């Protein structure tokens, strides 16, 4: 089975930063809009799978009103992976835009919010149109759920392949 760009991207991030304890996921969005719920759904799945540092879940979304305050509490030495929904071309719906750099939340709807993350994942949940809010509101929940499962699964797979060797070394005897 061929690995996706999302999987390859996350494997490279996990190889560079294998300690799960040093990773913070900032999952941006709201539970009040189908398309914009991608981030909080991923955050909820990651939290349920045992990730300790997750900002933005369905219970406590990290949306345009709270994102600036939420990221102020992140430790300086943390590796931040920002996750958000976005709109794109009709051909790109269901795909992911990944970057070795920050994400600018709210850009699709004209909001000016600070860039977030050392790495970023944007899920293209619908086609861009003249009314971005409407496009996000009318996004398929089935598509969003599938993309969220794919993202959370790829994250877990990447870090399970790149275990923190220092944690295992305490059980090894010198040769």
Regions found by a protein language model. Name each.
Residues 1-80, 85-175:
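N-terminal catalytic or cofactor-binding beta/alpha core of small enzyme domains
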């Amino acid at each position: 089975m061929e690995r996706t760009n999302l999987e390859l991207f996350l494997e490279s991030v996990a190889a560079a930063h294998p300690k799960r304890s040093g990773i913070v996921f900032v999952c941006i969005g709201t539970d009040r809009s189908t398309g914009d719920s991608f981030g909080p759904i991923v955050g909820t799945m990651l939290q349920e799978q045992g990730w300790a540092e997750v900002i933005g879940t369905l219970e406590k979304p990290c949306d345009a009103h709270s994102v600036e305050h939420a990221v102020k509490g992140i430790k300086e030495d943390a590796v931040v992976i920002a996750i958000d929904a976005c709109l794109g071309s009709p051909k790109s719906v269901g795909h992911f835009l990944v970057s070795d750099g920050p994400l600018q939340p709210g850009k699709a709807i004209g909001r000016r919010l600070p860039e977030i993350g050392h790495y970023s994942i944007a899920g293209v949940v619908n086609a861009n149109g003249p009314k971005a809010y409407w496009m996000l509101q009318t996004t398929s929940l089935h598509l969003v759920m599938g993309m969220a499962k794919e993202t959370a699964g790829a994250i877990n797979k990447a870090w399970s392949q790149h275990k923190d060797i220092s944690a295992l070394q305490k059980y090894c005897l010198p040769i």
